[in-house]
């Protein structure tokens, strides 16, 4: 009796086994490579968008006697929300008095002036590395009869639609183009303030290292002061002269000033400082204080 001749090809079971073995070798290589490529792409987008915001700021300043965007009116203070972000008038939006002074405004309302007056898209204020933040769409909040240039903020919960921290524009130390060119005016989200993706980082984990004046912390402790969105590696920072750079430490301002904290000095920057809260003010003209609005529950 003749025996059947075995085919030289693989059975389907053998094909599956070989495929799984190959994938076991290839996936550990391809997945991290894809993740790294995605991170690089997000970082490039964040830097480009922050640069575009910077150009719009300088254009705005050119139309307003050198003043960078500051919402509200004279004497307006930093508050948790606007009186009415979709109001018909500025007075109604910020709760100004009959002299068009006072009232409260969010940090993001000042950035929103770039949407109103300079045609910057709300998408430009969303960094893909900032989790929990999405592009502002008025329709989501029931506003269907107004254009984005007719509104006053990124909704009643602007922290969910604006990734970037901005120097406090209300009070005695608002920035103008007369400040030093290397003054930090905006950056990735402040790590000491609650974000859409989680609570503020514990400040006790942070200490400046030897790269700062008087720094005694370790490299890991210094990295704990960086923005969360870039795996503690640093943050993109916009300076007054319009350039954007990736700073590996948060104390990249004037006099090694920490851009995310209030300086403990009344005359200079401070690499440590104290974490800000709603209503905080810079300590002096050299103190960059880049903050975000609180997240509305």
Model-derived segments and spans:
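Amphipathic alpha-helical segments typified by the pilin-like N-terminal helix
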Residues: 2, 6-48
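Short, well-structured segments within or immediately adjacent to enzyme catalytic domains
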Residues: 42-297
């Amino acid at each position: 009796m003749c025996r059947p001749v075995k085919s030289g090809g693989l059975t389907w079971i053998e094909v599956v086994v070989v495929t799984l073995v190959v994938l076991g070798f290839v996936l550990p290589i391809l997945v991290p490579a894809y993740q790294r490529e995605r991170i690089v792409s997000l970082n490039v987008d964040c830097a480009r968008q922050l640069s575009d915001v910077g150009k719009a700021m300088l254009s705005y300043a050119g139309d307003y006697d050198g003043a960078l965007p500051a919402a509200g009116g004279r004497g307006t203070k930093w508050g948790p929300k606007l009186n009415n972000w979709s109001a018909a008038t500025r007075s109604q939006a910020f709760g100004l008095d009959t002299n068009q002074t006072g009232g409260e405004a969010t940090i993001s309302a000042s950035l929103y002036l770039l949407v109103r007056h300079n045609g910057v898209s709300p998408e430009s204020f969303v960094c893909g590395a900032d989790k929990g933040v999405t592009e502002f769409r008025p329709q989501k909040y029931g506003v269907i009869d107004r254009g984005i240039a007719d509104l006053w903020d990124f909704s009643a919960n602007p922290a969910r639609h604006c990734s970037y921290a901005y120097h406090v524009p209300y009070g005695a130390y608002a920035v103008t183009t007369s400040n030093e060119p290397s003054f930090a005016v905006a950056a990735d989200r402040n790590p000491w303030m609650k974000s859409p993706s989680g609570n503020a980082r514990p400040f006790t984990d942070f200490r400046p290292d030897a790269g700062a004046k008087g720094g005694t912390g370790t490299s890991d402790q210094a990295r704990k002061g960086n923005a969360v969105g870039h795996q503690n590696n640093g943050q993109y920072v916009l300076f007054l002269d319009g350039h954007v750079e990736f700073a590996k430490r948060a104390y990249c301002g004037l006099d090694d000033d920490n851009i995310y904290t209030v300086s403990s000095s009344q005359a200079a920057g401070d690499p440590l400082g104290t974490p800000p809260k709603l209503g905080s003010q810079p300590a002096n003209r050299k103190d960059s204080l880049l903050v975000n609005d609180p997240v509305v529950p």
